[in-house]
Amino acid sequence: MWRTIKKLGNYYMEIKYNYTTIFPVPIHQFDISGFDQIKNKLIDYAYDMQKRDSVGKTASNRGGWQSKSFIIGNEDDVLHSTLMNCLSGFPTIKKSFGLNGEAWININKTGNYNAKHHHPNSNLSGVLWIKIPENSGRIEFISPVDFQTDREIRSYTEEFRDENRIHHSYYFPPIEGRMLVFPSHLIHHVTQNKSDEDRLSVSFNITLNT
């Protein structure tokens, strides 16, 4: 809280200032301890899937390979088990809600990226980073708040903007073994892979059921 004393004629007034941030957008984060023990298995899983279906599908991917979607939990393997272990332990979702989802593999080679998009017909979406070389692309979310002009954002101090994350967009650095889960309506994209290696990840959509 901020306050100041101002003089008004022969009187003094105390002015108090405070603010409240409303309508926050939660971004959930899971970090897998000991990810190095399963990383190579997940990499092999991704490339094996690509060998079985080299065409894949085209969605937001620009030049990259994307697998066709598969139901999470339908197979008893390292990928399905990893996703289920993370999502079944969601501490901020009521136990009365069930989670059903589908996932797909992403392989972005040098120069590939994912264009701006959102995920309709689902409640939550997410990504698990498997193999992330340096400078291979990061995820950027576009603010759902409709600022009429850039002037409002620029008028705030940098400290205030950073403290309350008031920006047009927000980047998350990709880290191997980390999973992000976010509201499906959030527009986002993945920047270009500027490394000399493949970038591997698993994306997914979740529907919440009561």
Locations of the language-model features?
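Ligand-binding loop in jelly-roll beta-barrel domains
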Residues: I187, T191-S201
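Histidine-centered metal-chelating micro-motifs
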Residues: N112-Y113, H185-H189
